[in-house]
């Protein structure tokens, strides 16, 4: 997904940030909440010969994705034969006709809706995960039910939080070399582990927020 901050339309910017869902007791039951990556993205860019560990392209995603837009809303419906649930994402930002100030608030909302398509209750874990792409050598601050990526050098910041009291936050991914942080995070997701780590002093490679859910 393209991410732009501070009014800079960086439409080719794809930082390592994604939402995922895990379903307990289901083979291949962990998926990024996105559709398939177009094959043209996989070849040619810088460092693609090293496997593109800076991208999420290699993580499993939903087989089917249907996109619709009705400004200021956009919706994506996700389905996959491996998953006993359907997912719907609704994205929007404030838009009030004739109210320029409130329509310009630096806020974006992603609403995730899950529907149990099986005949029994299922236990799941939703997560939102991101590398510290604001400042790779910076810290990550905590907020209620979320975290804040920020940088003193360029006066930038990004807060991510969920509206759910059951949220658990991992404020600091595993601090290792190469792609160790990403590997550990994906292992947490695919095994249904919920990491609970408080903010730390010093470098924090990334952060995650987890929400356990039971779907009837």
Regions inferred by a protein language model and the residue ranges of each:
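Short Pro-Gly-centered flexible turn/kink motifs
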Residues: 122-124, 206-216
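Short acidic, glycine-rich loop/turn motifs
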Residues: 25-27, 78-83, 151
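Exposed beta-strand and adjacent loop surfaces of beta-rich binding modules
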Residues: 2, 18, 84-86, 121-123, ...
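Extended, loop-rich substrate-binding clefts of extracytoplasmic carbohydrate-active enzymes
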Residues: 43-107, 174-211
């Amino acid at each position: 997904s393209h991410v732009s901050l501070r009014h800079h339309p960086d439409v080719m910017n794809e930082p390592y940030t994604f939402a995922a869902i895990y379903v307990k007791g289901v083979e291949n039951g962990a998926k990024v909440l996105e559709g398939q990556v177009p094959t043209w993205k996989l070849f040619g860019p810088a460092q693609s010969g090293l496997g593109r560990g800076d991208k999420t392209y290699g993580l499993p995603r939903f087989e089917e994705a249907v996109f619709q837009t009705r400004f200021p809303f956009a919706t994506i419906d996700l389905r996959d034969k491996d998953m006993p649930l359907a997912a719907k994402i609704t994205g929007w930002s404030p838009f009030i006709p004739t109210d320029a100030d409130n329509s310009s608030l630096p806020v974006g909302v992603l609403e995730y809706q899950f529907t149990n398509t099986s005949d029994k209750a299922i236990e799941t874990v939703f997560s939102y995960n991101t590398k510290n792409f604001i400042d790779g050598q910076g810290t990550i601050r905590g907020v209620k039910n979320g975290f804040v990526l920020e940088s003193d050098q360029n006066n930038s910041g990004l807060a991510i939080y969920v509206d759910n009291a059951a949220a658990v936050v991992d404020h600091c991914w595993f601090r290792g070399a190469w792609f160790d942080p990403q590997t550990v995070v994906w292992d947490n997701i695919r095994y249904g582990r919920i990491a609970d780590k408080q903010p730390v002093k010093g470098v924090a490679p990334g952060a995650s927020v987890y929400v356990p859910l039971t779907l009837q």
